[in-house]
Amino acid sequence: MSLMSNFFEKSDVSRKEAESIISDTLQKCDDGELYLENSKSESILLDDNKIKNSSYNSDLGFGFRAISDEVVAYSHSNEISKNSLKQSSENLKSTLKSVKGTYNHEIPKSNKKYYDNINPIEQKSLNEKIKILNDVNDYLRSKGDKVKQVTANFLGEQKSVEIIRSGGETLSDVRPLVRFNVSVMVEKDGRKETGVYGVGGRQSYDSYLKLSLIHI
């Protein structure tokens, strides 16, 4: 099942209508596109033996760009609707009204997939992630009374992007991103030292957790 966002699913504008607005806006331009982005992120922080923070954010929006000769016009909105697209279209046309160009459909392009089509945020439940953080905290504190402070956190993100060019040509991508960090402070005879470990990248949490827990 694809995790690519359907940017028009909850909008009053259909994909066909959006493509029509894009083609109409760019017909006298050299180049341009509608760039759609849906970003979801989470952060879970354990500190001082308890979960100090847990947050989730979701952002949706678009950028509309038109290029004619040496002039670049750009408009953006965090609302994907018929009105916002039409307003952006009018803004671009107004900026480029005295400049004429010819849309280039032959610009080299690629839609190569670099990352797995996954949403790391949904691969584990919130309770599972909290349990892992608590287990890490318990394990490190079990190493002795010298361990005075343990901080551990998860950071996860999934970003879906789609680019629509004149004529309905579409390029899309899904970009996962995760991070797992641990910080430990130890104290002996009044001397404090801190060690930090972190790992992450554009894969799932599980891709890093097994290796991380072995190192810890």
What are the residue ranges of the model-derived segments?
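Acidic low-complexity segments
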Residues: 2-23, 29-43, 83-173, 205-213
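Broad gene-expression machinery/nucleic-acid interaction feature
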Residues: 31, 43, 59-63, 72, ...
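Generic structural motif
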Residues: 39, 69, 80, 157-159, ...
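N-terminal alpha-helical targeting/anchoring segments
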Residues: 42-97
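Short beta-strand elements
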Residues: 55-68, 171-200
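Short, solvent-exposed aromatic-acidic interface loops
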Residues: 78-80, 197-205
